[in-house]
């Protein structure tokens, strides 16, 4: 029997990526891992999910894109090499289509139960020739931890020949081997995996292979059947396995199996082995988390190198959640022939509730360490840029100020600051976006010191009592000074579908605070957004300025209401986990604002792991979508936000199949303008005066916005579907694919020219003021690295 088996563990925030291909020609006894791999063409695929047994229970939620010619055929029951003998006699149709030159959209999406004996799969996969030898099988067992994503691809040796014919198939199974009871232990993990299988041509209608499932639960499996045309001629296939853990640093054990029959895969599941390489034709190249983030050798010997520091948000990580962003930054830098080193700090994982100061100081100390401060090798880089998501934007603001003050300005004189970028960062906190009882809950420490910072709670400090976000925005502080040193300051803000950090606070637009519901029904940005690079004047925005006072009244008034609506929201949230809530006929996948006649709506989706999935209708698409909120419900705006936030988190809306073929045509950037600081002061003066008439409810937010607007900012407003907050950084490559265009837009901004040669002028600063803040603000005994 040809077998490849591997068992391993992966850690919090890591990604393991695998690239596999099958050696072609001859009887394949002497296949080597050094064989070159040609481009992938004409790929087809089928995804199969299992349910029923604890050994092979299918993961909930998923997606398949497959394409090819004449692929709607049924496997004969006699072909035992491709259909397990123990399967029952019922059949599930393959969702597939024939292609022609005049057709528009040919791929379908589907999921399959394991209670089948005959499955419609591509014609190329039928009739695997009967031989006396056992079918080839490759199996990899591994364990994923909260920081890891694994892709299983490694070389192997064996003496058994590979069955090489046009009727051959390749089965791939990824199984979450954690105990079933851990499905309920969400706050201890969660112990779920995100699995993706794709090829180089996944975006081509006629040559696509793309299968993914963002929620492979413990004791469930994710199956993909790859026809011969997909792996012939040594065409590569990629497998990526990512941990979905958020709250705890937990290991998740998984198994990867590759074979020509499902029966062989199941037989190997019981084997008590860690690693077995007995599949000579199968070549596996494994990129470990360390390899993915390994520094280029050239960076140690270059005088001009650009360091890009990535900072994650709350309950997030750099290694897995920002891997896609890192990959695209490096790719884009090659177009301008610039040596870019992308790094991220991992020391704040699972500790993001400890406050901006605590997190920022640790990040600052790490930054000094990797740049060689205090050693003969300083500076190790010539330029530096910082890119952060969500809470990370505030953390990196503190970190650059900390570095600036501790080195008395020498750091940024030696390493030139270029780009300061934030993505969905709560610059104005979150108190102005929600009723006051939400702010009070945060101020009481419901999410630790970070919640107090975001609710603009006054500091308990012997010298400074202003809220910390107000303090950081003060022009006399090293934080403000350090941010001002950067050549370009860019912020990205979601106009819709971001209930965690809405547009008002992420764009530093006071007049937009608390207007999430209004933005949901409009394609336009809030009225204070700049047009043609110039902020509107007070006269032009009289109605907008008035809305600030009205908005303050509404937010303040909502705090007087009873908490009944919030309680109902929580009850609704609990209902999301019931079977009845998961099986709804009135569901809808959010589509990008583009008309597409080929985009279909799912029918009867079952997202939460039902034992049987209805796939009898070949036109069905299987998506994991969220139940729609009843528009007549009595929920308040904040209650709806709570439900929507958790719905997006637990049941993420994945892109439609047609999106992957036409994603480059979808426009998500609503506006992209440069803010002129000189044109905004009259507007802020009017807003301040009006706010004073309403008991100064938004006085802190106005102060923060006014201070930061002393600097020039490039503001990019985007409109994303699904979970916009995490989609903005493409937390997972395919489930969050709506954010691809945002990342592309960001990389085009950062690398429109070679920054190493474009920005060389030294900075200037007030050293006396900077040094004075060092001991007063962040050499606090309560802060330890």
Curated annotation (Swiss-Prot):
Enzyme Commission number(s) from the entry: 3.1.-.-
Region (Disordered): 29-99, 115-140
Composition-biased stretches (Basic and acidic residues): 47-58
Name by which UniProt lists this protein: Putative lipase C4A8.10
Molecular-function annotations in GO: monoacylglycerol lipase activity
Database matches in PANTHER family: LIPASE ROG1-RELATED, LIPASE ROG1-RELATED-RELATED
Pfam families: DUF676 (PF05057)
Entry similarity comment: Belongs to the putative lipase ROG1 family.
Keyword Hydrolase included in the entry's annotation: yes
């Amino acid at each position: 029997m040809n077998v490849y088996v591997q068992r391993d563990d992966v850690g919090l925030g890591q990604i393991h990526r695998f690239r596999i291909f099958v050696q072609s020609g001859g009887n394949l006894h002497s296949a080597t891992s050094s064989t070159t791999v040609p481009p992938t063409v004409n790929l087809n695929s089928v995804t199969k999910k299992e349910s029923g047994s604890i050994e092979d229970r299918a993961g909930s939620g998923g997606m398949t894109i497959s394409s090819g010619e004449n692929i709607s055929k049924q496997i004969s029951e006699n072909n035992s090499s491709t259909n397990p003998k123990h399967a029952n006699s019922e059949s599930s149709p393959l969702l597939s289509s024939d292609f022609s030159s005049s057709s528009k959209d040919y791929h379908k999406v589907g999921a399959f139960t394991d209670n089948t004996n005959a499955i419609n799969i591509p014609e190329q996969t039928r009739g695997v020739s009967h031989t006396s030898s056992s079918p080839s099988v490759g199996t990899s067992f591994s364990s994923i931890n909260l920081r890891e994503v694994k892709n299983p691809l490694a070389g192997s040796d064996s003496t058994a020949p590979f069955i090489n014919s046009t009727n051959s198939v390749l089965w791939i199974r990824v199984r979450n081997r954690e105990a079933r009871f851990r499905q309920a232990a969400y706050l201890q993990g969660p112990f779920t995996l995100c699995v993706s299988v794709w090829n180089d041509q996944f975006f081509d209608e006629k040559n696509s292979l793309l299968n993914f499932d963002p929620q492979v639960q413990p004791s469930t499996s994710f199956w993909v059947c790859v026809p011969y045309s997909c792996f012939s001629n040594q065409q590569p296939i990629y497998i990526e396995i990512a941990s979905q853990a958020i709250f705890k640093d937990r290991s998740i054990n998984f198994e990867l199996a590759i074979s020509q029959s499902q029966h062989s895969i199941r037989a190997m599941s019981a084997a008590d082995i860690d690693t077995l390489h007995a599949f000579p034709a199968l070549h596996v190249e494994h990129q470990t988390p360390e390899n993915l983030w390994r520094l280029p050798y050239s960076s140690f010997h270059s005088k001009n190198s650009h360091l890009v520091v990535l900072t994650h948000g709350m309950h997030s990580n750099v290694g897995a959640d920002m891997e896609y962003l890192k990959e695209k930054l490096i790719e884009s830098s090659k177009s301008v022939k610039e040596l870019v080193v992308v790094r991220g700090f991992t020391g704040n994982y699972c500790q993001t509730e400890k406050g901006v100061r605590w997190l920022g100081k640790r990040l600052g100390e790490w930054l000094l360490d990797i740049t060689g401060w205090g050693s003969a090798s300083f500076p190790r880089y010539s330029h530096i840029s910082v890119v952060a998501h969500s809470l990370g934007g505030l953390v990196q603001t503190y970190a650059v100020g900390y570095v600036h003050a501790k080195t008395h300005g020498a750091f940024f004189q030696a390493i030139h600051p270029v780009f300061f970028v934030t993505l969905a960062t709560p610059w104005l906190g979150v108190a102005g976006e929600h009723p006051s009882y939400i702010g009070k809950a945060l101020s009481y420490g419901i999410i630790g010191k970070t919640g107090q910072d975001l609710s603009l709670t006054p500091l308990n400090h012997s010298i400074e009592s202003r809220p910390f976000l107000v303090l950081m925005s003060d022009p006399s502080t090293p934080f403000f000074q350090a941010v001002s040193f950067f050549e370009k300051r860019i912020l990205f803000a979601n106009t819709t579908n971001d209930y965690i950090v809405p547009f008002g606070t992420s764009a530093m637009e006071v007049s937009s605070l608390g207007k999430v519901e209004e933005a949901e029904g409009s394609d336009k940005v809030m009225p204070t957004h700049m047009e043609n690079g110039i902020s509107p004047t007070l006269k032009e925005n009289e109605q907008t300025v008035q809305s600030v006072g009205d908005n303050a009244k509404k937010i303040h008034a909502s705090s007087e209401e009873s908490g009944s609506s919030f309680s109902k929201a929580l009850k609704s949230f609990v209902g999301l986990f019931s079977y009845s809530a998961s099986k709804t006929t009135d569901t809808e996948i959010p589509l990008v604002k583009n008309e597409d006649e080929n985009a279909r709506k799912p029918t009867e989706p079952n997202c939460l792991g039902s034992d049987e999935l209805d796939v009898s209708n070949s036109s069905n698409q299987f998506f994991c979508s969220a139940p729609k909120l009843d528009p007549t419900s009595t929920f308040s705006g904040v209650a709806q936000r709570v439900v929507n936030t958790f719905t997006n988190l637990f049941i993420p809306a994945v892109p439609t199949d047609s999106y992957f073929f036409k994603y480059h045509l979808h426009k998500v950037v609503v506006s992209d303008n440069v803010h002129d600081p000189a044109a905004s002061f009259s507007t802020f003066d009017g807003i301040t005066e009006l706010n004073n008439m309403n008991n100064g409810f938004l006085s802190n937010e106005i102060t923060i916005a006014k201070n930061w607007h002393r600097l020039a900012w490039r503001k990019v407003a985007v409109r994303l579907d699904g979970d916009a907050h995490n989609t903005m950084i493409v937390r997972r490559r395919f489930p969050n694919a709506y954010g691809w265009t945002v990342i592309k837009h960001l990389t085009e901004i950062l690398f429109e020219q070679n920054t190493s040669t474009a920005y060389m002028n030294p900075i200037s600063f007030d050293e006396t003021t900077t040094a004075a803040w060092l001991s007063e603000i962040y050499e606090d005994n309560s802060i330890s690295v």
